């Protein structure tokens, strides 16, 4: 089946969904492609219950709720979703691009917005003997239902945002949390680190710094303890039912890497004015985009979506100038 639209957006994470809204506000029709069966990207697939603290007007919002609200915001513009399929082939035809998906869907558009986050993703697993025996029962790389960790003794490994944020969140329901990190300094947001250290003073979280994961001990997929080791090879046994290793994601751009885009370390290089790639009419926004001074924040991706689509307006509408209007005016006219 062949479709024709104004904009194709690759990725249905928060930035991709906000791009749908921005395009709609500018009168552009959108088709969206995502490899997952449901919309939401990493927010839904990896951490639907994870609290997000840096969305304006929301002191705290769960990832799944953010996706729900973004979907509702985009819905009036009637986007067409092509889920459970990947964008695998790109062809340029006169003023149009043609994308072919893994389900042989063909979509023609004048503009492409790549908001694919980390691309295809999977966890970086710690090199522990027999860890696969515990996966899915005692060892988890993603959390989609934190209630199952209530009353548990949990080892969280890592020093970034995911490790610190989950330690804070799970401390409300867990019996005990050990946060294992090879250094005393954490790379999470400073305010999150401040909260972490405050909770650690109460004893709900124990900071096990200067140590790394060394071994797992248990029977029949039931974890009983986690062995950690410091730089002097001194070991310590942590009594725990659950291990949550948060060492980031493996990234793979898949077929996007073959589209002639400038790619560096699994990211797409863009200009930092309008986030256009080296191919005119193709933009990259959100975590997949790279430029000097890039901040990997959801709100940064929102701004990139707005800028790129305002810039793309003249291409979609054959050189027509865009006269800026505030959303209250535009939405009022739509109603």
Curated annotation (Swiss-Prot):
Keywords: FAD, Flavoprotein, NADP, Oxidoreductase. Its cofactor is FAD. Pfam families: Pyr_redox_2 (PF07992). FAD binds at residues 34, 42, 47, 87, 121, 287, 328. Its EC number is 1.18.1.2. The keyword Oxidoreductase applies. The keyword NADP applies. InterPro entries: FAD/NAD-bd_sf, FAD/NAD-binding_dom, Fd--NADP_Rdtase_type_2, Ferredoxin-NADP_redctase_2. One of its GO terms (molecular function) is flavin adenine dinucleotide binding. It is an enzyme of class 1 (oxidoreductase). Binds 1 FAD per subunit. It catalyses: 2 reduced [2Fe-2S]-[ferredoxin] + NADP(+) + H(+) = 2 oxidized [2Fe-2S]-[ferredoxin] + NADPH. Homodimer. Belongs to the ferredoxin--NADP reductase type 2 family. HAMAP family: FENR2 (MF_01685). This is Ferredoxin--NADP reductase. It comes from Rickettsia felis (strain ATCC VR-1525 / URRWXCal2).
């Amino acid at each position: 089946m062949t479709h024709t639209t104004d904009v194709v957006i690759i990725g249905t994470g928060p930035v991709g969904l906000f791009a749908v809204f921005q395009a709609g506000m500018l009168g552009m029709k959108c088709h969206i492609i995502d490899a997952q069966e449901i919309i939401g990207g990493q927010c839904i697939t990896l951490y639907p219950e994870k609290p997000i603290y840096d969305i304006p007007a929301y002191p705290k919002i769960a990832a799944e709720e953010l996706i729900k609200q973004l979907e509702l915001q985009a819905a009036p513009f009637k986007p067409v979703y092509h889920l459970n399929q990947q964008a695998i082939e790109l062809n340029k035809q006169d003023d149009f691009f043609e994308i072919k998906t893994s389900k042989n869907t063909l979509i023609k558009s004048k503009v492409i917005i790549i908001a694919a986050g980390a691309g295809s993703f999977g966890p970086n697993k710690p090199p522990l003997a027999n860890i696969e025996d515990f996966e899915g029962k005692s060892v988890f790389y993603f959390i989609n239902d934190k209630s199952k960790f209530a009353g548990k003794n949990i080892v969280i490994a890592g020093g970034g945002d995911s490790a610190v944020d989950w330690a804070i969140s799970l401390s409300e329901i867990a019996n005990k949390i050990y946060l294992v990190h090879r250094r005393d300094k954490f790379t999470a947001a400073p305010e999150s680190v401040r909260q972490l250290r405050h909770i650690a003073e109460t004893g709900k979280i124990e900071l096990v710094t200067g140590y790394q994961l060394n071994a797992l001990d248990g029977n029949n997929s039931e974890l009983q303890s986690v062995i950690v080791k410091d730089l002097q090879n001194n070991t310590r046994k942590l009594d725990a039912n659950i291990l949550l290793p948060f060492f980031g994601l493996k990234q793979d751009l898949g077929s996007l890497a073959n589209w002639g885009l400038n790619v560096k370390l699994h990211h797409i290089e863009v200009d930092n004015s309008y986030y256009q790639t080296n191919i005119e009419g193709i933009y990259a926004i959100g975590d997949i985009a790279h430029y000097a001074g890039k901040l990997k924040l959801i709100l940064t991706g929102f701004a990139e979506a707005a800028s790129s689509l305002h810039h793309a307006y003249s291409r979609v509408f054959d050189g027509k100038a865009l006269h800026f209007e505030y959303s209250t005016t535009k939405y009022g006219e739509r109603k």
